[in-house]
């Protein structure tokens, strides 16, 4: 059994989702929560809250691998920069724990979870709930975090069947 931490980075609210995946690629729900970063006085303090929150989650749930959504180009350059910085802080937090990080674009995640790279957020939320047999409606950041973890679980399962690493199976170095 492998535990995967999925991260949907944000500068105000970061979604985290944790799943377990068995050797056959079957996924099961473990935990999800938002890391709400708005309580801090300034942006660097929000990044500190993000790093500390991820460290606490890693200590409590002991993931073995991490999957994170890649940054997309936002309309507002300042928002894109802050999102990139939040993503960097999240990656730093888990790399300091020697966890391997796997990155997926939003379109790759939607394709893996819904079957269509241009799927709507509501479709992702619905499919994640079905795949993990959840009875609650997930918020978008939680669904996205769990979706990136599920995407990595699927890539991992395919890689295992082919005798490849997850990076090789996804065509990355």
Curated annotation (Swiss-Prot):
Signal peptide residues on this chain, from the entry's feature table: none
Active site: 8, 69, 141
Residues the entry annotates as binding Mg(2+) 2: 69
UniProt main location, coarse: cytoplasm
One Pfam family, short name: RuvC
Biological process terms in GO annotation: DNA recombination; DNA repair
Cofactor dependency: Mg(2+)
Subcellular location: Cytoplasm
Gene Ontology CC annotation, any one: cytoplasm
Gene3D superfamilies: Ribonuclease H-like superfamily/Ribonuclease H (3.30.420.10)
Domain of life: Bacteria
EC annotation from Swiss-Prot or TrEMBL: 3.1.21.10
Catalytic reactions on record: Endonucleolytic cleavage at a junction such as a reciprocal single-stranded crossover between two homologous DNA duplexes (Holliday junction)
One GO molecular-function entry: crossover junction DNA endonuclease activity
Keywords: Cytoplasm, DNA damage, DNA recombination, DNA repair, DNA-binding, Endonuclease, Hydrolase, Magnesium, Metal-binding, Nuclease
Top-level EC class as recorded in UniProt: hydrolase
Subunit structure as annotated in this protein's UniProt entry: Homodimer which binds Holliday junction (HJ) DNA. The HJ becomes 2-fold symmetrical on binding to RuvC with unstacked arms; it has a different conformation from HJ DNA in complex with RuvA. In the full resolvosome a probable DNA-RuvA(4)-RuvB(12)-RuvC(2) complex forms which resolves the HJ.
PANTHER family from the UniProt entry: CROSSOVER JUNCTION ENDODEOXYRIBONUCLEASE RUVC
Assigned protein family: Belongs to the RuvC family.
NCBIfam families cross-referenced by the UniProt entry: ruvC
HAMAP family, A to Z: RuvC (MF_00034)
Protein name, entry field: Crossover junction endodeoxyribonuclease RuvC
Provenance organism: Stenotrophomonas maltophilia (strain K279a)
């Amino acid at each position: 059994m492998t535990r995967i931490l999925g991260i949907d980075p944000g500068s105000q609210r970061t979604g985290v989702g944790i799943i377990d995946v068995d050797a056959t690629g079957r996924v099961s729900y473990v935990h999800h929560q938002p890391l709400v970063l708005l309580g801090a006085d300034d942006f660097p303090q929000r990044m500190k809250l993000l790093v500390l929150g991820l460290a606490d989650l890693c200590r409590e749930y002991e993931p073995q691998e991490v999957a994170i959504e890649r940054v997309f180009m936002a309309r507002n350059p300042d928002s894109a920069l802050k999102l990139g910085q939040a993503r960097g802080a999240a990656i730093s937090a888990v790399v300091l724990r020697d966890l391997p990080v796997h990155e997926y674009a939003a379109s790759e995640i939607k394709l893996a979870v819904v079957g269509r790279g241009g799927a709507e957020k509501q479709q992702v939320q619905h499919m994640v709930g079905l795949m993990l047999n959840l009875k609650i409606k997930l918020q978008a950041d939680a669904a996205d975090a769990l979706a990136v973890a599920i995407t990595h679980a699927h890539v991992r399962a395919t890689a295992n069947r082919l005798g490849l690493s997850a990076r090789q199976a996804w065509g990355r170095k």
